[in-house]
């Protein structure tokens, strides 16, 4: 894949820096697409939102299995938004910022993909675990391992690191010439299987089961806000973030056809990462007291887990949980 053919700035930027700036000498006054100005406007707002959310989750709120996942998801979103903001500014300035700082921009580009991949994996884990809590409530409340959320998050971060490294080394890095186009194609197939045949179906199936079970049972209504948070977050991700992964995979093979669409997909991904704190706020806030309650109260309500696992053995022996049929 010839580096000069790459037009998506997240993939293109390391290439342009490594191959020199000769191509941009006569293009100093090029017009910047409006999509990049929108990205530069949205990404810092989303970065601040997720930063505030992360601070509350880490220092002001009591943790439960669900908030552990949300904390890690917020970190992934912060990483993505920070990188896309810096890269979009560099693109708008015709790579003036990155001149002479090749490895810094490489790190930002890889971190962007890293945050994106992690977001997909974490949302799948959230959906699957919530589905299990509805299907097997007694196990969830009494026998679920105490540090399961933290362990799952650690494994998903490691998987994301592996996938991102493979994608960068085999398909993006122009410095490494020992890898053939077939190597990149093999990585594309692996990522496609992982994303579209493993994680996305798991997310969809578990979310569907969750919706069906909740609609059939009124006992879960008291914690409906948590389920709404999960479902809306997943829907927004599927609409705004998944197209970027599909286009990236197609882009490596058919750059001339899908290159221009990448700018739109990057904007959508930025919107997705910026939207999550808004979702938590509007779902958790009371309609009559919106903008009047403290953020801690709103977030606590949004993330309240009525089925939170119980650690005391006596409680588990005496608790009666209605089985979902």
Swiss-Prot record:
The chain crosses the membrane at residues 37-61, 66-86, 105-128, 150-172, 186-206, 225-245, 264-284. It holds the Pfam family 7tm_1. The keyword Transmembrane applies. Residues 1-36, 87-104, 173-185, 246-263 are extracellular. It is a multi-pass membrane protein. Glycans are attached at residues 5, 16, 22. Residues 62-65, 129-149, 207-224, 285-325 are cytoplasmic. One of its GO terms (biological process) is adenylate cyclase-activating G protein-coupled receptor signaling pathway. Its main location: membrane. GO terms for cellular component: plasma membrane. It is found in: Cell membrane. GO terms for molecular function: angiotensin receptor activity; angiotensin type II receptor activity; G protein-coupled receptor activity; peptide binding. CDD domains: 7tmA_MrgprH. Keywords: Cell membrane, G-protein coupled receptor, Glycoprotein, Membrane, Proto-oncogene, Receptor, Transducer, Transmembrane, Transmembrane helix. PROSITE patterns: G_PROTEIN_RECEP_F1_1, G_PROTEIN_RECEP_F1_2. Gene3D superfamilies: Rhodopsin 7-helix transmembrane proteins. Disulfide bonds: none annotated. Receptor for angiotensin 1-7. Acts specifically as a functional antagonist of AGTR1 (angiotensin-2 type 1 receptor), although it up-regulates AGTR1 receptor levels. Positive regulation of AGTR1 levels occurs through activation of the G-proteins GNA11 and GNAQ, and stimulation of the protein kinase C signaling cascade. The antagonist effect on AGTR1 function is probably due to AGTR1 being physically altered by MAS1. PANTHER family: MAS-RELATED G-PROTEIN COUPLED RECEPTOR, PROTO-ONCOGENE MAS. Belongs to the G-protein coupled receptor 1 family. Interacts with AGTR1. Interacts with FLNA (via filamin repeat 21); increases PKA-mediated phosphorylation of FLNA. It is linked to The MAS oncogene has a weak focus-inducing activity in transfected NIH 3T3 cells. This is Proto-oncogene Mas. It comes from Homo sapiens. The lineage of its organism: Eukaryota, Metazoa, Chordata, Craniata, Vertebrata.
């Amino acid at each position: 894949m010839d580096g000069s053919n790459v037009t998506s700035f997240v993939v293109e930027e390391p290439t342009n820096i490594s191959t020199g700036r000769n191509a941009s000498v006569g293009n100093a006054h090029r017009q910047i697409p409006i999509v990049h100005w929108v990205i530069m406007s949205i990404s810092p707002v989303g970065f601040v939102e997720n930063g505030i959310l992360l601070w509350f989750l880490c220092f002001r709120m009591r943790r439960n299995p669900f908030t552990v996942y949300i904390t890690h998801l917020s970190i992934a979103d912060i990483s993505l938004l920070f990188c896309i903001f810096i890269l979009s500014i560099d693109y708008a300035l015709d790579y003036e910022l990155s001149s002479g700082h090749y490895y810094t921009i490489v790190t930002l580009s890889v971190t962007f993909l890293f945050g994106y991949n992690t977001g997909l994996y974490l949302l799948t884990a959230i959906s699957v675990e919530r589905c299990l809590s509805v299907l097997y409530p007694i196990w969830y409340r009494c026998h679920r391992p105490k540090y399961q959320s933290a362990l799952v998050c650690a494994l998903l971060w490691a998987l994301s690191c592996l996938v991102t490294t493979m994608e960068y080394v085999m398909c993006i890095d122009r410095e490494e010439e020992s890898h053939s186009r077939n190597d990149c194609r093999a990585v594309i197939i692996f990522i496609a299987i992982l994303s579209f045949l493993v994680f996305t179906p798991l997310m969809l199936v578990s979310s569907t089961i969750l919706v069906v079970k909740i609609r059939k049972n009124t006992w879960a209504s008291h914690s409906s806000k948590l389920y709404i948070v999960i479902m809306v977050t997943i829907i927004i991700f599927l609409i705004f973030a998944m197209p970027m992964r599909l286009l990236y995979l197609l882009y490596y093979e058919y750059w001339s056809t899908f290159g221009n669409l990448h700018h739109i997909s990057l904007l959508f991904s930025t919107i997705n990462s910026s939207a999550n704190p808004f979702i938590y706020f509007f779902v958790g806030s009371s309609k009559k007291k919106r903008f009047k309650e403290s953020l801690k109260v709103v977030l606590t309500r949004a993330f309240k887990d009525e089925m939170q696992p119980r650690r005391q053995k006596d409680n588990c022996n005496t608790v009666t949980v209605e089985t979902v049929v």
